[in-house]
């Protein structure tokens, strides 16, 4: 019996002049060239993938690619999920993100926005700080556990994160957002959770203070990105380490954009819930506030909110929760030419970045080339003013939505030397 002949390999037909031979790579039956030399085929070209322009495909392979593209799986990963509702927390307009803003236009808007800010704070130039109290607190349970793990060789940033988490947790405890009564806590939702570090330390503190009590929490971790070195498994191990009589927490991690998130299908029925986040970036804060108030019936079970905000420079006028507050500031200014809301707000976000642009002047200050001709210290103060306007609008909006049974306030939970992004929004029952 004769052995079967080997199937003939299809070799790339590209001829390499320098080596005086054909390319040694394999090709498809339908092509003359391998993938490396396919670009030489005049009948094919690379085009952006319609599902994700960040990568390209051969035009001839488009149909087959669309059936297996990873982006397709991501687009449909939440199909028929009860917690998914497209753009339920976002406000979209036809002209969103279509206007090209030139450098000159932006600088012009900023120069017109600066006097409006100064006018708003003219009665008390430090009003933007004095009305946001510095409320630094320490949680000894968290610090006794975490600080010994941070030796002198660790990145100082790790200790700064721990200090921030300690203050946020103790501020929640002192306002009865975190309680330690039997069955008093069931749902924790961390928005923009990343690795879920804040949830882990909240979990540890509640476990430590729930000895001899029933503890069966549900942590709902929300983030639109994938994350490495997550704390999900460690949160379950912490329960056994701190108290072996307690059940480990239930953890639900969902990769989803907050703009599409309905939280009520995720909550345990008739159980209280707490919303937390540390350094929730830009517009994500506005989307989160809308998510929390999307179904007014959920307010009956809301125990509290703790959101440490950041990155106001990436907020946008369409999705900001309280445009009326900003419009009232524009309208109360006696200027010859008032900017439209969208232009004013865009300038406001850029000015807000000046509050966190470092602790010393830049080269543009040394050369006196900054387009505002303002010194660094004055720009930093204007940045704090702009940030205060954005935060106060959110605070007022949430207070209106939650009603008289809640108190909503802003605090500075650490010194600027620990974090320049040190303002948190707290909501708790009176």
Curated annotation (Swiss-Prot):
Keywords: Cytoplasm, Metal-binding, Methyltransferase, Nucleus, S-adenosyl-L-methionine, Transferase, tRNA processing, Zinc, Zinc-finger. Zn(2+) binds at residues 49, 55, 65, 69. A zinc finger (CHHC U11-48K-type) spans 46-73. It comes from Vanderwaltozyma polyspora (strain ATCC 22028 / DSM 70294 / BCRC 21397 / CBS 2163 / NBRC 10782 / NRRL Y-8283 / UCD 57-17). Belongs to the methyltransferase TRM13 family. InterPro entries: Methyltransferase_TRM13, Trm13, TRM13/UPF0224_CHHC_Znf_dom, Znf_CCCH-type_TRM13. tRNA methylase which 2'-O-methylates cytidine(4) in tRNA(Pro) and tRNA(Gly)(GCC), and adenosine(4) in tRNA(His). This is tRNA:m(4)X modification enzyme TRM13. The gene is TRM13.
């Amino acid at each position: 019996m004769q052995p079967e002949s080997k199937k003939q390999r299809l070799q790339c037909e590209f001829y390499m002049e320098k080596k005086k031979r054909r390319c040694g790579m394999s090709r498809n039956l339908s092509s003359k060239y391998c993938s490396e030399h396919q670009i030489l085929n005049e009948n094919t070209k690379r085009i952006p993938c319609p599902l994700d322009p960040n990568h390209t495909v051969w035009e001839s392979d488009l149909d087959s690619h669309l059936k297996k593209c990873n982006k397709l799986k991501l687009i449909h990963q939440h199909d028929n999920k009860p917690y998914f509702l497209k753009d339920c927390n976002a406000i979209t307009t036809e002209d969103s993100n279509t206007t090209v803003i030139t450098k000159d236009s932006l600088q012009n808007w900023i120069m017109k926005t600066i006097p409006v800010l100064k006018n708003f704070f003219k009665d008390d130039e430090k009003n933007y700080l004095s009305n946001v109290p510095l409320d630094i607190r320490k949680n000894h349970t968290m610090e006794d556990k975490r600080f010994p793990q941070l030796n002198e060789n660790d990145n100082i940033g790790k200790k700064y994160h721990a200090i921030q988490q300690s203050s946020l947790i103790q501020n929640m405890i002192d306002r009865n957002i975190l309680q330690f009564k039997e069955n008093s806590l069931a749902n924790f939702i961390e928005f923009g959770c990343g690795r879920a570090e804040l949830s882990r330390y909240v979990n540890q503190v509640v476990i430590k203070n729930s000895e001899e009590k029933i503890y069966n929490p549900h942590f709902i971790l929300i983030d639109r990105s994938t994350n490495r070195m997550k704390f999900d498994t460690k949160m379950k191990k912490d329960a056994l380490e701190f108290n072996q009589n307690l059940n480990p927490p239930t953890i639900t991690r969902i990769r989803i954009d907050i703009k599409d998130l309905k939280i009520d299908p995720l909550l345990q029925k008739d159980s209280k819930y707490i919303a937390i986040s540390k350094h929730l970036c830009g517009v994500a804060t506005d989307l989160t506030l809308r998510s929390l108030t999307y179904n007014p019936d959920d307010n009956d079970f809301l125990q509290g909110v703790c959101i440490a905000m950041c990155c106001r420079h990436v907020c946008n006028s369409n999705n900001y929760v309280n445009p009326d507050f900003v419009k009232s500031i524009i309208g109360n200014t006696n200027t010859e030419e008032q900017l439209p809301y969208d232009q004013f707000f865009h300038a406001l976000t850029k000015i807000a970045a000046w509050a966190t642009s470092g602790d010393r002047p830049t080269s543009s200050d040394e050369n006196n080339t900054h387009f505002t001709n303002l010194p660094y210290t004055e720009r930093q103060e204007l940045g704090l003013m702009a940030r205060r306007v954005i935060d106060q609008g959110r605070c007022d909006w949430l207070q209106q939505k939650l009603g008289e049974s809640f108190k909503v306030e802003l605090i500075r939970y650490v010194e600027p030397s620990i974090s320049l992004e040190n303002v948190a929004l707290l909501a708790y029952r009176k």
